[in-house]
Amino acid sequence: TGKPIARARVPEVEIPMEAEQLGWAEQHPNLWWQYLCEATQKLLTESNINADQISSIGISYQMHGLVLVDRDLNPLRKSIIWCDSRATPYGEKAFEKLGKGYCKDHLLNSPGNFTASKLAWVIDNEPERYQKSYKLMLPGDFLAAKLSGIPQTTITGLSEGIFWDFKNDQVSKALFDHYQIDQSLVPEVVDNFTVQATVSKHGAQATGLKEGTPITYRAGDQPNNAYTLGARKAGDVVATGGTSGVVYALTDQLSGNELTKVNTFAHVNYQPQQKMF
């Protein structure tokens, strides 16, 4: 029915953000996981909901954060989150090198200060840490991986990081080559509204969820907001106001003509055979 049954918030205040230098903003991914575990346990206890009553799991997360993990899915550094501006010069240089035409037609955005540019900063400034990296993920991908034990991502997630080539429907070889990113860092790409993975034994023990519970959805907070407000098909326009004010408009046309005015990402229901931006 879409009716909320129960809610839990952990912690009661915002998760702390670390800023070692002016313009930096980081959070440790393990804190997200810790609070997810605590919130899930609290929700199950206070609501009297049995774990076996939960049919599937969806995750909404802060967009654009960079998470690098080793083969055991342990973070190799704190996440460089959305409001960290250190990567801006890398994005500006990539835009100049790749050209406005490529960025408009393939990326639908300037690389800017998005996730790919944040990774370029790590490659340039922390090469030893980069060399130890097994997979790159967005914040929601990390939480799903901790639940399931399987690193995965989505096209909508890759697009918010400006990793995705929409014209060829694959990761952008030109961008990866420019930033010298190893494409093997990209996890398995899965669709939303499908069984992406299931909660592992470890994930169940940590959260109180039932082992085998399907994970079927993940999306950044803004596209998730758009979807929950009813933006599902081309022509839908919705808006939200809060910490930021955002207007969302959906289209099925591949166009980056508004490159300097708006951000264009794959919507949560994007599929190569049924595009939605």
PLM feature spans:
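Acidic-glycine-rich active-site phosphate/pyrophosphate-binding loop
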Residues: A6-E14, P89, N192-A206, G256-H267
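Short glycine/proline- and acidic residue-enriched helix-loop micro-motifs
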Residues: Q21-E26, K100-N109, P272
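Short, hydrophobic/amphipathic alpha-helical packing segments
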Residues: W33-Q41, A116-L119, G220-P223
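A generic secondary-structure signal
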Residues: A39-E46, W121, N125, L229
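Glycine-rich phosphate-binding loop of actin/hexokinase-like ATP-binding domains
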Residues: L66-R71, P75-K93, S133, M137-S172, ...
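Gly/Ser/Thr-rich active-site cleft segment
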Residues: Y102-G220
